[in-house]
Amino acid sequence: MLSFVVGKRNIIAMETRQIIGRERECDLLTRICNEREARLIALYGRRRVGKTYLVKNYFEEKFDFFFTGSFETPVQAQLSLFRDALCQYTGKQYDTPKDWNQAFAMLRDYLSQIKKERIVVFFDELPWMDTPKSNFLSAFSYFWNSWASTLDGLKLIICGSATSWMIDKIIGDKGGLYGRVSHTIYIAPFNLHEVELFLQKRKGILWNRYQILQAYMIFGGIPYYLDMLDKNVTFAENIDQLFFKHNAPLRTEYEFLFRSLFKSSNVYRQVVEAVAKKNKGLTLSEIKTALKVGASGKLTEVLKNLCSCDFLRKYSEYGKKEKSAVYQLTDLYSLFYQKFVVGNNGRDEHFWSNISDNTRNAWAGYAFEQACLHHISQIRSKLGIQGVLTNVCTWAMDRKTDSDGTQWPGVQIDLLLCRGDHIINVCEMKYSQSEFVVSREYEQHLRERNNTFAHFTKTKDALHTVLVTTYGLKQNAYSGSIYTTVTADDLFER
């Protein structure tokens, strides 16, 4: 029998089951399982992020009932699979239910016979059960509201990769499930600290942090992709095998990823591909122009869903209104795929091993920036401002000439930490294979950029330049222009 007591025994059990990271999520599950009342728990997050793995391993697969939806499967076939699962758990034979209402009635009859203090039911890939004209959601709502919510000790866990569906239909539902979800648990991709633990403990891969950072910049913190790495070949050979060999698994993953997450997946792909073409991202107006579409609530919904599924991030520019917000591609796997895999059919199967240093470094510069933006918490920790109210934004300006002839350079600042103590950390994110060297020209660039920002924004806050770079800063006559340095090692902190 599972023990849910928080303490040393539970930690040891978690290590045995090889749950990497997820301490907060496991602690929350423990607390929920120690509650007497019935609970409806919704887990959501990007596909391949490890939602199913977490639930199965936390509970050691000891469920009183488990069922997973089947992708693009008609309702009658889903109901037949549900019948098979019920037969497996009860040891009895059942006819296939005629609809979901009957299926849940059969489940209710089975669960009501279980005499246990705690009953655990797990529905995985719930969105896939909600096929057209199946009335699944209304049947599920009735099952929970009319009976399951009254069964003390029941822990009903629902999970889905289609994050937008989970948020709209379950977590934010305005109908039968309004306010019924007891707990929502968002499963985020691993951070660098967790990627390092995963590679060492799960895969036995003892790469240095520079190599781990490169892996993160390609795969993001997605455990499913990281689990494909082979410790017996080099880093470059791993990338070739996974992306560029004939039938490489991550070459075909991209299309399935979108089809499994979104209806009308072509529209979602078109948006991602449009945004991917511009490193700084696109505004809503620019996306409409790129896709040649007019004003549409559908496009706004697509963008919202892509943000909720961790493909895009929406960020505001300093001092500008919401309508000027920019959408930027932040899913690192999609970024790498768009840059190197699209249109690569028939190319060298050892493409990554043979690619030029200039091409690789150009990509790495931008990918490193995105990796940094996924670790703002670690950057704030290094700066010692975790307890300071901080807004995260960006700022950009095209080259301008004033009426008096004064020329101002074009400026692009990818990360501003605007603090409540009237300090703005102006962050420079620079990928380097050694200590970063501030030249005279670069020092002048930083000075002109800060002056331009202060002049046009009219800010009275102090501007502190922060350098985020792989190996730190080489001291020289110009390094004093950097207020604080954050290294890759700092990004690996918890």
Predicted regions and their residues:
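Phosphate-binding site recognition
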Residues: 1-354, 358, 465
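A cross-kingdom feature that marks ATP-driven nucleic-acid transaction machinery
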Residues: 318, 325-494
